[in-house]
């Protein structure tokens, strides 16, 4: 007689890990591209300030 509990635990772990990977990937991409856009805006503003100044 085999117990169903190990199968349930295994399937739940696989499901939890899958959900964590999906949510982690989405959050990671959002953070990466959000931070890159912020740095790019800061860089553009920085150089625009120097372009307006007379040297």
UniProtKB/Swiss-Prot annotation:
It is an enzyme of class 7 (translocase). It catalyses: 4 Fe(II)-[cytochrome c] + O2 + 8 H(+)(in) = 4 Fe(III)-[cytochrome c] + 2 H2O + 4 H(+)(out). GO terms for molecular function: cytochrome-c oxidase activity. The chain crosses the membrane at residues 13-35. It holds the Pfam family COX6C. GO terms for biological process: mitochondrial electron transport, cytochrome c to oxygen; response to hypoxia. Its EC number is 7.1.1.9. This protein is one of the nuclear-coded polypeptide chains of cytochrome c oxidase, the terminal oxidase in mitochondrial electron transport. This is Cytochrome c oxidase subunit 7s.
